[in-house]
Amino acid sequence: MAAAAAAAVGGQQPSQPELPAPGLALDKAATAAHLKAALSRPDNRAGAEELQALLERVLSAERPLAAAAGGEDAAAAGGGGGPGAAEEEALEWCKCLLAGGGGYDEFCAAVRAYDPAALCGLVWTANFVAYRCRTCGISPCMSLCAECFHQGDHTGHDFNMFRSQAGGACDCGDSNVMRESGFCKRHQIKSSSNIPCVPKDLLMMSEFVLPRFIFCLIQYLREGYNEPAADGPSEKDLNKVLQLLEPQISFLEDLTKMGGAMRSVLTQVLTNQQNYKDLTSGLGENACVKKSHEKYLIALKSSGLTYPEDKLVYGVQEPSAGTSSLAVQGFIGATGTLGQVDSSDEDDQDGSQGLGKRKRVKLSSGTKDQSIMDVLKHKSFLEELLFWTIKYEFPQKMVTFLLNMLPDQEYKVAFTKTFVQHYAFIMKTLKKSHESDTMSNRIVHISVQLFSNEELARQVTEECQLLDIMVTVLLYMMESCLIKSELQDEENSLHVVVNCGEALLKNNTYWPLVSDFINILSHQSVAKRFLEDHGLLVTWMNFVSFFQGMNLNKRELNEHVEFESQTYYAAFAAELEACAQPMWGLLSHCKVRETQEYTRNVVRYCLEALQDWFDAINFVDEPAPNQVTFHLPLHRYYAMFLSKAVKCQELDLDSVLPDQEMLMKLMIHPLQIQASLAEIHSNMWVRNGLQIKGQAMTYVQSHFCNSMIDPDIYLLQVCASRLDPDYFISSVFERFKVVDLLTMASQHQNTVLDAEHERSMLEGALTFLVILLSLRLHLGMSDDEILRAEMVAQLCMNDRTHSSLLDLIPENPNPKSGIIPGSYSFESVLSAVADFKAPVFEPGGSMQQGMYTPKAEVWDQEFDPVMVILRTVYRRDVQSAMDRYTAFLKQSGKFPGNPWPPYKKRTSLHPSYKGLMRLLHCKTLHIVLFTLLYKILMDHQNLSEHVLCMVLYLIELGLENSAEEESDEEASVGGPERCHDSWFPGSNLVSNMRHFINYVRVRVPETAPEVKRDSPASTSSDNLGSLQNSGTAQVFSLVAERRKKFQEIINRSSSEANQVVRPKTSSKWSAPGSAPQLTTAILEIKESILSLLIKLHHKLSGKQNSYYPPWLDDIEILIQPEIPKYSHGDGITAVERILLKAASQSRMNKRIIEEICRKVTPPVPPKKVTAAEKKTLDKEERRQKARERQQKLLAEFASRQKSFMETAMDVDSPENDIPMEITTAEPQVSEAVYDCVICGQSGPSSEDRPTGLVVLLQASSVLGQCRDNVEPKKLPISEEEQIYPWDTCAAVHDVRLSLLQRYFKDSSCLLAVSIGWEGGVYVQTCGHTLHIDCHKSYMESLRNDQVLQGFSVDKGEFTCPLCRQFANSVLPCYPGSNVENNPWQRPSNKSIQDLIKEVEELQGRPGAFPSETNLSKEMESVMKDIKNTTQKKYRDYSKTPGSPDNDFLFMYSVARTNLELELIHRGGNLCSGGASTAGKRSCLNQLFHVLALHMRLYSIDSEYNPWRKLTQLEEMNPQLGYEEQQPEVPILYHDVTSLLLIQILMMPQPLRKDHFTCIVKVLFTLLYTQALAALSVKCSEEDRSAWKHAGALKKSTCDAEKSYEVLLSFVISELFKGKLYHEEGTQECAMVNPIAWSPESMEKCLQDFCLPFLRITSLLQHHLFGEDLPSCQEEEEFSVLASCLGLLPTFYQTEHPFISASCLDWPVPAFDIITQWCFEIKSFTERHAEQGKALLIQESKWKLPHLLQLPENYNTIFQYYHRKTCSVCTKVPKDPAVCLVCGTFVCLKGLCCKQQSYCECVLHSQNCGAGTGIFLLINASVIIIIRGHRFCLWGSVYLDAHGEEDRDLRRGKPLYICKERYKVLEQQWISHTFDHINKRWGPHYNGL
């Protein structure tokens, strides 16, 4: 195949090719068919030439690219159609030729049929949603596209969804990367076997055409590239070229999608070297090709690359066998030799930008391996295509094309080799790039596909020197930013380190290369080669040494540092990524004994590098003062490989350890870090700014600790186990600068430390020793034990969520390590140590996540304070752990007081490290412990409980780890006399404890109290002699001792002896000049450690002789010292535990303890009170008095606040609470009294100084969401499911009003209904009152307050001054009586007729607006507020704009909205009765006054007042009918509840109870008639005639007016007169309920119709007259409410079944008034029977509103909505969201849907919820609430298996609905409490 193509392409072309005839040219298909036929012949030479000629002409690169390069003149140059036309033409030709004359689509389909789809290979770009299954993955980078994932079976697997950061490709079907069990259905079958062979002629044309096409593309790329000018590459120009090439590259991409057959043709074309050579060499006559070749050479040269003319250069093409090609050439000396300082570095583009302060250093030695860095020779299209891809900085389209080809195995290998060949060039381009982030992502997008495959990585390692190339490229990259190290010896240092301020490090530019390196090291075969290759190891250690000592900190001693550098981020990231992670990768392959050699290699080169480093920094024996670097990667490599060698490979530790001198050097810098940590925490580095604290915290933080502090501590443990213990201990105290403090004298002088820092530095030193001696992470703990200890430590600090635990537990950074998140061991350990606390919703509104908390037995046995201290980033966490421990002990009754940290037994030491315990048994430590115990007992300054705690801990550690029991013969009497060399006779702590020390000589300032004392008379010369020899000039000269040891060791190596000099720096440490002279004093001590401990027991317990040896009562206790009694407790317990252990280990100790206890301690004389103490006592007294005063004040304040508390406790749920009284009136006072929460005065509200209620007005559409179905609607999760809002309460009321407005007079329609179902105004209060003038000044002060508030004062918003509840208005309280004591309430005995007349008369009186008072002004302003709360469209329903009827309708509808909402808050009925908090905290009474006052300004003309129609018979004129244009709305079509509100609000306030009852009675008659009419319409023709006759017979009975049968029969016969029933067709009957109507079902139907009215009326009565609501069963609700409203006659007998008709009380004869009402309908139904019927049936049975029902699994929502397109722009929105009220899909922040500066969510919240919107953000799983101009994040209702939210789907674990949370969300929506419960609101500026 390839040969044929080559023949066609190659050879000298005739200079004037024969072009096809013009006719053929026009008909592309015919030409293509002709050529295909010609080429199919055995002799296809002519055909081939003809095709070539055609392609020459069609694919000539000259035309379009003149345009591309020409920029502005593009249009002119491109000829007629511009560049686009020519290119389109060329593409059309190509498609035709490929198809060989057939249709291109058919051709594509034909090729697809031959696709052996064994691999998916789908390529995606950044932000694509993919899946990763750790159960199925072999490589940690494995990923699957959504389709393959869902079609495979991953149930129960450890998978997660993720958003791709850099792009990726689907690995389904690739068994190198994942297990076959995880393949999806499509890729499971190895289907290649049943795919037929590709017919030769199908792809024949492709083989001829594609080489030319690709060459043409390459020519475009050559032409279009212009070397960027000096000012940096002009990405604009490059992008322009790429845009022009978009169609061509897309065409290639489409070809790859045709499947395997086409991919293999493309592979042949791309990798065929002959094709490439013939077409691109530029040797032919074609001028265009020549020019293009020149441009290519220029581009190569400008890239700093040489083009070897076919010579084999440096053996790149043929790698030599054996060691790597770089061997050890120039690398070893690299650190040592520094070249000249070169500022004109080719790569130095930002050298001028602020980095000039520190000169860059260039290494002079030949670190560059020319062959790797500078040579590129392209031999195929693929190679040159990749070159241009890199040159153009990895355009997305090109990357996708190159990756789409990867399923072809041959291509994959070729491409990987090409990629490796270009690796150095990639690095250079990356360094220069201005878009390094994007470029990095694209590089990794490619490399992760290549290097994750172990087989492929191994192949390129062997054939292309992959490791050499990577290491060299990394080294070369870092060389460009080296500076001279200032560590230790600034002037003479020869060491170079990376400069962390350089862009390369600051922007993490190196990460793609490092990440590739880590990726290939994860393959065993590759890592093995690396560990075997000495040259590579040397180079790598060289690379690591660039980071050794970087980011050096120098302590500021005088001024605060001017500029806080943030370079430490870069430094920590670099060490972790570039040094530690490759280290973990290598370690993971050193797990077994067989790999010992690898470890030896690494350790060897590591030590060499360390030795070079010590030489380069000129290190002798002392670290330079006031310097610290946290970066010692060489030390850490060494430590980690040592640890691995002992733990896994059974290597003998000593065989890999250096000599003593090297060990001494090795410990210096890690120890310096530990001391610096203590200094930083002691605030000694405070002048260096916050960043130094940041470094100290990062060093121990969970992602870094096991690569930093853990290896450091381990290395120190190793050094301590092998060095002289006295030397080590003294080094520690010297490093921590507390040597001077360790004196028996009460005063001392510290030359290196300020007094204020001494205590914390001493604590630091002791804590460090405790950690060093207790920690077993690398000294023998198994992985599971480590995991358990880590987990316990984290859980003890705080309860943790599962994800934060995963994050906090130091994970082996290498992804292939054993313990991975979610792994079996993690989960099993977690369930063993912790209990799960399910997520709860707390009353304050804060949502808890699912948490893990330590089990009781963990607190009891496993709490390890040492581990906690090691792992805390913040010091407060240690305290938190102790507080929780204390709480546990109190709760479980184990210890009541304040406990000390418990002593925890340690796992046994690995034998290799036994030497570590010598530290506990060395005299130096014993002297320190003795001294500190003595000082604590003597109350010397700067000692704390913490110091004592650590001292006791060390003693106990020593006892636990003491040598075998000492022999009793060991003489212990007369010890002091014989012991001349030191304080203590031996080194065993057990025996040293009982050793008495009599005298000590100390150096003290002359002012010290000790100096005055005479020396003891009894001192014998012998004793003095012993003192002089005992080296106690000051306690013991730690420093001198250390110096001596170091000197000895150094003198051994005589060659260096002459270099040993005291470091120059020591002069800085001389004591301040003003220091008082020191003098020697001798102290009488006469104590042993045991005696000090016993005295300490007395001191701690505050009692003399408090210690009684427990074994005197129970000798058993000595054999079994582990007694639970001693495991928890305070200092006293600790001392007792130690004494018991000391006694049980030695009979001598036991005897001495008993002796000491027998000596009765003399009683202590009473203390004299000194002046200072008196001062303290006075202070105490004063404090006590102040406390009492405060208590008194608080009590006063508390009573004031009591009412508030009762309110505040219950914001979200309106039930279950203590009622909250708005007023504080006494029962006998008739006038209501209010407290002002601002000025604190109480009094009535008056016209001049009105009081008001703090209220929040908000528009609400909750009522409109009610449906007649109990089941909430489901959120649509497929295209088929849709939600149509026809059945909502709002829609039904809308339809009804428009229907009325179509046929009846507008002004009358506006009185027949209520509005406010959508956008109604809801008023709520917290119940607090204030003077309105106080409120105004309060608002003024808020306006001037500059603090950022979560509300807008300009919009009238504020928070209640007392309870801080959100509010935006004040509702004036009407002066007058208290509701409960209303004089108008008393019943009168007037007849109903009299009352009806009174009502009419009162309504007729015009309501004069009260005189201009403050109160009336406030009433008016609050009315304005209420109107402005909702949008105009929700309050303007009149056909004539601005009609007063509109205002009238709006006002009584406000009352309706509030009553209806209260009913919903009570659960939709009044069965529970009582005054629920909602009732007590209601402001309906005050609201009614405001509304009534305004409504009485509109008088209804008595002609039109519905009251008349209800209570009087009028003359019926049958001729009237339809004379006037639009009649009034018939009274039977009126909404009775609206009528009720109109009647009541038209009355003068306050209303009399009997008038209220009268109105209710009259309206009930109308309501009942409506119920009967509705019933008659609902039933069938037969039922109607049956009822008509049955009722007619009873009409003459006495109580006919109260019999529903009679009334129903009468209504049917009246309505029959119109055409109401006549229209029923057959389909109507089918719809009718087929139920048989029994008297019970009819009664129920009538009651159900009337109940909503009764409920609202009862609520209204409750608010107006303060009457309590009775509670009842649901079935008796009607009768209870009816009697409560006075509808039932008092003598009504309850034993009969209840009949609703018995509530009727007709003001005029029933049959007459019914006739009158029906007559109004008759004339209307004669013309519009259909509408007439619809208006009679009023749907009144609304169920409670609900949010949409959500699916169980979040993935269901996500998969449907995250790909759903926006209906406006048809693109997939960046932030899709869905409304949980109505299910609308919206674009959050989407500009496509923006209307008049409002984004879609804000707009939707206004249309759907009148300003309240509840949206689920699809890509974040979070709910966002919009309320007016503010918004807040509410949280998530979807939680994972561990009860946690996953905001932004970062973890991508499966999420499940949390029904409790969703219920809470719904409750807050219904109760309108979002504003009160959620605290974090911010303005959205209409941008959501």
From Swiss-Prot:
Comp. bias intervals (Polar residues) = 1016-1028
RING-type Zn finger ranges: 1306-1364
Q: Phosphoserine: which positions carry it?
A: 343-344, 1199
Q: How does it sit in the membrane?
A: Multi-pass membrane protein
Q: Coiled coil: which residue ranges?
A: 1168-1199
Kindly indicate whether the keyword Transmembrane belongs to this entry.
yes
Name the pathway.
Protein modification; protein ubiquitination
**Its Gene Ontology biological processes?**
embryo development ending in birth or egg hatching; in utero embryonic development; negative regulation of calcium ion transmembrane transport via high voltage-gated calcium channel; olfactory behavior; positive regulation of protein catabolic process; protein ubiquitination; sensory perception of smell; suckling behavior
Please provide an example of a Pfam family that matches this protein in its UniProt record: zf-UBR
Q: How does it assemble?
A: Interacts with UBE2A and UBE2B.
Q: What does this protein do?
A: E3 ubiquitin-protein ligase which is a component of the N-end rule pathway. Does not bind to proteins bearing specific N-terminal residues that are destabilizing according to the N-end rule, leading to their ubiquitination and subsequent degradation. May play a role in Shh signaling by mediating the ubiquitination of Kif7. May be important for MYH9 function in certain tissues, possibly by regulating the ubiquitination of MYH9 and consequently affecting its interaction with MYO7A.
Q: Which family is it part of?
A: Belongs to the E3 ubiquitin-protein ligase UBR1-like family.
Q: What name appears for this protein in its UniProt entry? A: E3 ubiquitin-protein ligase UBR3
Say which species the protein is native to. Homo sapiens
From the UniProt record, report the name of the gene that encodes this protein.
Answer: UBR3
